[in-house]
Amino acid sequence: MKYRSVLFVPGHEEKKIKKAYTLSADLIVLDLESTVPDDQKENAKKIITECNVNKNKTYIRVNSDLDLEFATKEKFLGILYFLL
């Protein structure tokens, strides 16, 4: 599928996550990588889960193997890997 618009959203900012799903982006990427401070990464996963996002239009950008485990368990549409 081709995406015309992709919106990246910091995974630890609940208000921005909720707002993203009211917009018309074709794909939303919830970021657990560089936009989330290290001390907020676990909290970001909790926020994403509690926001009950539309997983059929959501990718997760992961930072570590633990994030990858979370993304796989939650069954998001796709996963973007961290930068090397």
What residues fall within each predicted segment?
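Expand to "…catalyze enediolate/carbanion chemistry for C-C bond making/breaking, isomerization
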Residues: 1-84
